[in-house]
From Swiss-Prot:
Protein name: Aspartyl/glutamyl-tRNA(Asn/Gln) amidotransferase subunit B
Enzyme Commission number: 6.3.5.-
Name of the coding gene: gatB
InterPro entries: Asn/Gln-tRNA_amidoTrfase_suB/E, Asn/Gln-tRNA_Trfase_suB/E_cat, Asn/Gln_amidotransferase, Asn/Gln_tRNA_amidoTrase-B-like, GatB, GatB_C_1, GatB_Yqey_C_2, Gln-tRNA_amidoTrfase_suB_CS
PANTHER family with a match to the protein in the record: GLUTAMYL-TRNA GLN AMIDOTRANSFERASE SUBUNIT B MITOCHONDRIAL AND PROKARYOTIC PET112-RELATED, GLUTAMYL-TRNA(GLN) AMIDOTRANSFERASE SUBUNIT B, MITOCHONDRIAL
Length: 499
């Protein structure tokens, strides 16, 4: 099958080699574990973290005479994902046997979908940026297909000095293999694609996206070429399990291939592994072609068929997806594309923001959520679900600023108190005497005192109005940050006789 390159070469994404510029071509095959209580063809549990071989049915262990029974929930989840990817849903698909031998594959074959997948072509829009002008570039990455398949078990090599063991808990767990077109041209684009795909499946509730648990992992296909030429020979980097590692693997592999080609060599089509400790890829085996797996329709499973009404019913139940929420945040709340993009990265963050923003200024709330809340969560290595500051508490802090009860600086201190100690914001302000000083006469006395003690700076400020900020800072310091900043600023300018 001929692959059509739909993207125009862009010099800002070229990689400089010794003999000229190169372009990296990237496609990805992402294995996403479906959220379901039981496996694709058996009733065994899919719960993560159990003792080895505790969630294994006779079907998973490939005992003779045991026939697979398709889990309908897994079918629904695959269709939901396809709809979320704006993809064509195939009303008829076929399960095939993919034949290969591996110790953690008891059947000697994997049940997958080869010729007739459940989901056809779709697309994902990724945003790259911001650039030096604060602008984002939106790039469409095509989805080739999505098909259902079984996961294999897990080989364990660290349990005994001379023997390996097999854990079949994962054997038979339902996977969606989501295959992109080779539309990505940089490590940043690949990372953005993986991030966006993970966000979509999490919003849909079809995969938890926990890469550290292996429930989402990527096979990354990398090749290089001279700009405008035909695609080069690709290498596949298997089972990359973090977004950061995806970027590192691509950057190393592209440089490796460029070095070989510039030295007059040729690229072997092969499967490689990424060594995270060394930051490099290494050869695993020669890359198999489809005929090596001897695909044929599974005789134990009928073709999977459903009608359009089944698809329409699932489409009607889909949640609002990140791209739609982002547009709404920009259009209805006046947020920048950058802020909106951050707020929709996780459904829980978007929900938190919306709760706080209800009846309040969206830009102000976005600033607090992004800079203060997410900053504190990142510092403490917590998830949004673990935040000690509830939407109601943050909303109260913002209300206190708007009412003029506290200043922005006091609000930051109040946020810290609630983060570490909890409590009602209004009650804390009352009990700790945190209200800002709004008495003009009291503020004026503080301004007069500072100016009287710094007559030299007064003279300088009259010549250089920018120095007025020094007086504002001193007044705020003297009043413990409680003076109303706007009132202080106005009085300082009035006393100095500047506009």
């Amino acid at each position: 099958m001929e692959i059509v390159d739909t993207r125009t070469p862009n010099s800002k994404r070229f990689i400089s080699g010794v003999t000229g510029d190169w372009e990296v071509i990237i496609g990805m095959e992402v294995h996403a574990q479906i959220i379901s209580n039981s496996k694709l063809f058996s009733g065994a549990s899919t719960k993560f973290g159990a003792e080895p071989n505790n969630h294994v049915s006779l079907i998973d262990a490939a005992m003779p005479g045991m026939l697979p029974v398709l889990n309908q929930e897994c079918v629904r989840q695959a269709v939901r994902t396809g709809l979320g990817l704006k993809a064509r849903i195939n009303l008829r698909s076929v399960f095939d046997r993919k034949n290969y031998f591996y110790p953690d594959l008891p059947q000697g074959y994997q049940i997958s979908q080869f010729r007739y997948p459940i989901v056809g072509e779709g697309k994902i829009i990724i945003s790259i940026g911001p650039d030096s002008n604060g602008q984002f570039e939106d790039i469409e990455v095509g989805i080739e297909r999505l098909h259902l398949e079984q996961d294999a078990g897990k080989s364990m090599h660290d349990q005994h000095p001379t023997m390996s063991f097999v854990d079949l808990n994962r054997s038979g767990v339902a996977l969606m293999e989501i295959v992109s077109k080779p539309d990505m041209r940089s490590a940043d684009e690949a990372k953005a694609y993986m991030t966006k795909l993970r966000t979509i499946v999490r919003y849909l509730g079809t995969c938890d996206g926990n890469m550290d648990e292996g429930s989402m992992r990527a096979d990354v296909n990398v090749s290089v070429r001279r700009p405008g030429e035909s695609f080069g020979t690709r290498c596949e980097i298997k089972n990359v399990n973090s977004i950061r590692f995806i970027g590192q693997a691509i950057e190393y592999e592209a440089r490796r291939q460029i070095a070989i080609l510039e030295d007059g060599g040729v690229i072997d089509q092969e499967t490689r592994l990424f060594d995270a400790a060394k930051g490099e890829t290494r050869s695993m085996r020669s890359k198999e072609e489809a005929h090596d797996y001897r695909y044929f329709p599974d005789p134990d499973l009928l073709p999977l068929e459903f009608d359009q009404a089944f698809v329409d019913a699932l489409a009607a139940e889909l949640p609002e997806l990140p791209d739609d929420i982002k547009i709404r945040f920009i259009n209805e709340m006046g947020l920048t594309a950058y802020d909106a993009s951050i707020l929709v990265t996780e459904k829980a963050i978007a929900n938190y923001f919306e709760k706080v923003a209800h009846g309040r200024d969206g830009k102000t709330v976005a600033n607090w959520v992004i800079n203060d809340l997410l900053g504190a969560l990142n510092k403490d290595n917590r998830e949004i679900e673990e935040t000690p500051v509830s939407p109601d508490q943050l909303g109260s802090i913002i209300d206190l600023i708007k009412e003029g009860t506290i200043s922005g600086k006091i609000a930051k201190d109040l946020f810290e108190i609630i983060w570490h100690e909890g409590g009602d914001p209004r009650q804390i302000v009352e009990e700790r005497n945190m209200k800002q000083v709004t008495d003009t006469k009291a503020i004026e006395r503080a301004v007069d005192e500072i100016m009287a003690n710094n007559s030299d700076k007064v003279a300088q400020a009259k010549q250089k109005p920018a120095l007025a900020g020094w007086f504002v800072g001193q007044v705020m310091k003297t009043t413990g940050g409680k003076a109303n900043p706007q009132t202080v600023n106005e009085l300082v300018k009035l006393k100095l006789g500047i506009d």
